[in-house]
Amino acid sequence: MTKKNFNDEENESLLETYNKQQQKQSISTTNRSDQKFGINNANKQFSLNNKKSINGEEIDEEELIEDTIFFKFKLDSKQRNSIKLFIQIVSLVILAGYLISINALYFSTNARSIIFYPSINSNTTDSGSVSPTSTPSPTPTPTPSPTSLLLQTLTSTTTSYDSSEIEALNGGTFNMKYFFYFSTFDILLISYFISLFWLLLIFSDSFIYHTISYIITIIALIYNVIKSYFTITQILSINNNIITTSSSSNEIYNGSDSYLPNESPLFDSLKVREIIIVIVLVGIPLMVLFLVLHIITLQLSFKKYKRLSDKEKQFYNQSNEEKRLNKKVEVKHSNLKRLIQLSRPELPIILAAMVALVFSSLTSLAMPYFFGSIVQVVATTHSFNNLNSSTLALVVIFVIGSISTLVRSWLFYLAGQKFVARIRRNLFSSIVNQEIGYFDQCRTGELLSRLSSDSQVIQNSVTVNISMLFRYTIQIIGSVILLFITNWRLTLLMLGIVPVLAISTVVYGKKIKQLGKQFQDELAKSSTTGEEVISNIRTVRSFSKEQKFIDLYSKDINGSYLIGKSLAVATGVFSGIVFLVAQLAIVLIVYVGARQVLDGTLSTGDLTSFLLYTLSLAMSLAFISSLMTDFLKAIGSSDRIFEIFDRVPAINVSGGKQIQNPLGEIELKDVEFSYPTRPNNSVLKGLNLKLSKGTITALVGPSGGGKSTVIAMIERFYDPNSGSITFDGIDIKELDPVWYRGIIGYVSQEPVLFAGSIKDNITFGNDSATMDQIISAAEKANAHSFIEEFENGYDTIVGERGVRLSGGQKQRVAIARAMIQNPMILLLDEATSALDAESEYLVKQAIDEIMKDRTVIVIAHRLSTVINANTVVVINQGKIEEMGTHKELLNNTDGIYHNLVKRQLSSDD
């Protein structure tokens, strides 16, 4: 067996292949990791040469680091999720422990003082026993406050107690049954809040779901505050009742010790203050800690990046040498957050609209209260004065609400129109500033769809929908608060539907966002097909392919229809679930509320108000679910738009050096190039070419050899894969593209005119040109005579792409457009091929005149175009095969140029 030996070149090749594989593997791993944590990788480019822009600045990844409090720990996804789960458990233990303590304090207080409530129908004996049949000593009944009346419902579930219960109360025990019920409820409620928060984090990393998570967290904290307030208020009420009763009834206060072991009020003023202080001092830090833990959870859910300081860079690079792959990273925020940031210029209008929105929402919240008042008047007092005042209040509320709604709608719509107009301007700017290679890869119809369809979806979301979202959010929060005030038991019963709605919303939201993006993609396909057919209708008609493209367009439309059908099914299922759950909840609330009315614990007016608030809440939830659909569609559409926003052009449109006194010499050195759409197919292969000032260079050769590519490279439509192109010895990559292209006159093989007048198209090369200069340029291009024959002369509209002019007329207008620019370099891509012999001769005379002291490159298959060139360059398969004058190359009978001329002369004969 012989051992295979590798030379140095083979070793270097193997090493290079291995490094590329490792780099691809690392990039793939990074992409998967970033996608998991919500980083959009659509525009990430890992290249040794291309930099990515962060806030307008190009930064390498080695200068960036994860900007979270955990970046030094290098946590993977499993470790992050484990920490998040641990935080949720700690949060649950903290809040549950706090609420259990509150319940223990509350029910202990209630048990020690319940014998002083006048509702207890019990008698005492001298021995301290209690007899249900004995007559209690008369004691003054304290007048409770409205708050205490509301809070006493927690304990006034019975109106009489037997002796064993009183003895248990006298012993200082508390009602274990109710303590267990309420503590269990609190634990379940907080568990629900935390579980919902966790579900939202698991199902999505988007900004909107994390915002909902924050709202849920705040609701949990508000519940804590309400619970603490109830406890403090009830303790104060109990303490006041004890003091009042003991001071007015010596029989009870000075009776047997079995009534009250301590012959003093349960809490004096000092102790009450101490209890309140303890609740506040313990509760507030716990709430802050709870919020901090959730902020940490969000920190673990997103990867953010910051620029390293010199000290951090040194530390990070020393400990992470494997990170030195020179990859580029682009930082992106969630699309919703970016849309909000883009709307900052409209912030004053939005704030004014928000004020009107608050008034509009408050009037909606006030209506159920006054409707309930009217019902209560009809059911009880039958007072016309109360009826009139309540009705008048409703009329005033309606007027205020109408005016507020008018102002709100107007301002939000105005802000939305300004916002979307700026989005479209920025999007169009981003599109036209991309390099030419980008347009080779993207279809025109798809880009037009981004400008029209996707922008329209965003417009609807940021105008009407955003105002409605804020309005219904305020109504939901206000309705929940007023429901708690009206009857907290029924409110808690109603909130049982929230878990079902929340989980449905999360699952539905993910599905809608996915379908929304697919729907916009299919619309873009159909737009592309339609644009191509309409713009090339003459070709379609000449081949009688109308039905073929109708079928193709129908196929594209059918694709969007199928996705739209899935979207409709998802929307229908979600709406059905929401409606069913909401209606069942209303039926249950009506039943329980009616029982409370029959028991006398709830008034008819309060039940009416409660039902109206419930209906308002249900309608608001239903509207928000519909708005969520539109928002998720908008987010899906914004994905496409922000991909264009974030894409950094490979070739800048401006910025760079400007040469004060240019000579006009161009040199191509070892240029290799392949088009972005065909990266494996080399078009230019090590091409070397020098173009001197004032010389005419003709490029000839078989079709597909690379002649037009050379023109595109000189114009810097593309950058070479390797090698360089210099202008007066300076690489054109260092030159200002605006200045550089300003000294180049270009006439393409298929000149394109814009849908304006002939004058507009000629002045496209020089916006400041006078009418005399326009006419002079047209005369030099032999275009003035046919322009004057038109009824409107130079103001004649040429139609889309110059469709109203003949091929020769379009060519001459394009030449005039190049001439008026007074360029230093002329690029003529078969510029006279569309002219007849006489026009070509006249145009050639004009071109010969403006060629003096200019660098000229001309591509032509016609012998007459290149016969007077200083140098003829034969390009075949991306290489220069021959170079010399026309006579020199013609004398080479075996050369490509000789054969080309011979074939053309034969065809002319």
Swiss-Prot record:
Tell me yes or no: is Aminoacyl-tRNA synthetase among this UniProt entry's keywords. Answer: no
Q: Which residues cross the membrane?
A: 85-105, 182-202, 206-226, 275-295, 347-367, 392-412, 480-500, 572-592, 607-627
The listed locations are:
Membrane
Q: For bias kind Pro residues, which ranges apply?
A: 135-145
Q: Name one Pfam family in it.
A: ABC_membrane
Name this protein carries in UniProt? ABC transporter B family member 1
Q: Which GO terms describe its molecular function?
A: ABC-type transporter activity; ATP binding; ATP hydrolysis activity; ATPase-coupled transmembrane transporter activity
Q: Which positions in this protein are listed as binding ATP?
A: G701, P702, S703, G704, G705, G706, K707, S708
- Name the residue ranges with Polar residues bias: 14-36
Task: Cite the Gene3D superfamilies for this sequence.
Answer: ABC transporter type 1, transmembrane domain, P-loop containing nucleotide triphosphate hydrolases
What InterPro entries does its record include? AAA+_ATPase, ABC1_TM_dom, ABC1_TM_sf, ABC_transporter-like_ATP-bd, ABC_transporter-like_CS, P-loop_NTPase, Type_1_exporter
Signal sequence interval, chain numbering? none
Respond yes or no to whether keyword Electron transport is given for this record. no
Where does this protein chiefly localize? membrane
The Low complexity compositionally biased stretches are 125-134
